[in-house]
From Swiss-Prot:
It comes from Methanosarcina barkeri (strain Fusaro / DSM 804). It holds the Pfam family eRF1_1. Gene3D superfamilies: 3.30.1330.30, eRF1 domain 2, Pelota, domain A. The gene is pelA. It is found in: Cytoplasm. InterPro entries: eFR1_2_sf, eRF1_1_Pelota, eRF1_2, eRF1_3, Pelota/DOM34_N, Pelota_arc, Ribosomal_eL30-like_sf, Transl-rel_pelota. SUPFAM superfamilies: Dom34/Pelota N-terminal domain-like, L30e-like, Translational machinery components. This is Protein pelota homolog. Its cofactor is a divalent metal cation.
Length: 350
């Protein structure tokens, strides 16, 4: 997500963003609420006097509208967030319209009060767009390219070449050593790695990688490509390997937290689930990590429940808040447990 304008007085005001990924659309589903004023460029029928005489001639024109949101739907498989509401700014004020927010859409969101988790979501999404979550190595005998996968495209980090001695073990290992050394400097701690290329060089390299950097190599997977360089990177993207990695990394983090929660619950240990038990634990200052399902957060706000007060109190007590996606299994499990739970600093009796 790219923030293009931020104009806040305290917690009131406007933030303008560009949605760059499907994840950004998912974030926006939980940032935008009923009652927000949202501006974006859209298409709407331009009704002139002649159009009304011959309605078959009515054409849609591009206009910038501001609507007061009264309903929103995230269509995951259509890659679209739909915002429905009454037009307050632009043409046909007082009529209803639906804004289709897609990847690449620019929009402005105006709120009377921005909540902590909404601002944090924007910050997290903005930071995620700047750092690579996946590093790719396209390698063949004597040649390797390292690239970063960003939301806006692929950035070539380095090219390593060994022009001769490909059959000499010492020189080949020296080439592999140089690639590994570049990766030590290039790979952020949370990033995954794709090793790609034609032939068997990539398999030989991954063995060397596992021997010299086992922790980093454990995050790597292998993909076949017909060539190296930018064309090889594009092959990896077309096959969907990067999308799978980025989705799986989130699922893995949320799965680990759910495993911790289930284990503590089964031991009658340092865990609480359900709103009542979580509030009780919070009163004792015991909440270390609050787990809340995105649907529970949205439903609570729509019903007027002060769920945000609970989130603020956890943060004020130096606790961490993790919002789970119910689009994935860990989030579904959490939702079935009441949508809210906590890992505790110490055991609390109910």
């Amino acid at each position: 997500m790219r923030v293009t304008n931020r104009s806040l007085k305290g917690r009131e005001g406007e933030i303008a963003v560009t949605a760059e990924t499907l994840d950004d659309l998912w974030h926006l589903k939980y940032i935008i609420e009923k009652g927000d004023l949202v501006f974006s460029v859209t298409k709407r029928k331009a009704d002139s006097a002649s159009d009304k005489i011959r309605p078959e001639k009515v054409e849609k024109v591009k206009v910038r509208l501001g609507i007061r949101v009264d309903d929103l739907e995230f269509h995951k498989f259509a890659n679209r967030l739909r915002l429905h509401g009454m037009i307050e700014r632009g043409m046909d004020v007082g009529s209803y319209h639906t804004l289709n927010i897609e990847i690449g859409t620019n929009l402005s969101v105006i709120k009377e009060h921005w909540k902590n988790d909404q601002l944090q979501r924007i910050k997290d999404a903005e930071e995620a767009s700047k750092r690579p979550k996946v590093v790719m190595v396209a390698i063949e005998e004597g040649d390797a390219d390292i690239g970063f996968v960003h939301h806006y495209g692929i950035e070539i980090y380095s090219h390593i070449r060994q022009s001769s001695g490909k059959r000499e073990t010492g020189l080949r290992n020296e080439f592999f050593r140089e690639v590994v050394e570049q990766l030590r400097h290039a790979v952020p701690e949370e990033a995954s790695i794709v090793i790609a290329g034609p032939g068997f060089t990539k398999e030989d390299f991954i063995k060397y990688f596992q021997e010299t950097e086992p922790a980093m190599a454990s995050k790597a997977l292998i993909e076949d490509t017909s060539m190296i360089g930018m064309s090889g990177f594009q092959e990896v993207l077309r096959r969907g390997a990067v999308d799978r990695i980025m989705q799986e990394s989130r699922i893995a983090r949320e799965s680990a937290l759910m495993e911790d929660l289930i284990r503590e619950i089964s031991m009658d240990g340092k865990a609480a689930y359900g709103l009542g038990d979580v509030k009780n634990a919070l009163n004792f200052g015991a909440v270390e990590t609050l787990l809340v399902a995105d649907e529970t957060l949205r439903e609570g706000r729509e019903k007027g429940e002060d769920i945000d007060k609970l989130l603020r109190e956890v943060e004020q007590a130096q606790g961490k808040v993790v919002v789970f996606s119910t689009a994935f299994e860990p989030g579904e499990k959490l939702h079935k447990l009441g949508g809210i739970a906590a890992l505790l600093r110490f055991k609390v009796r109910g």
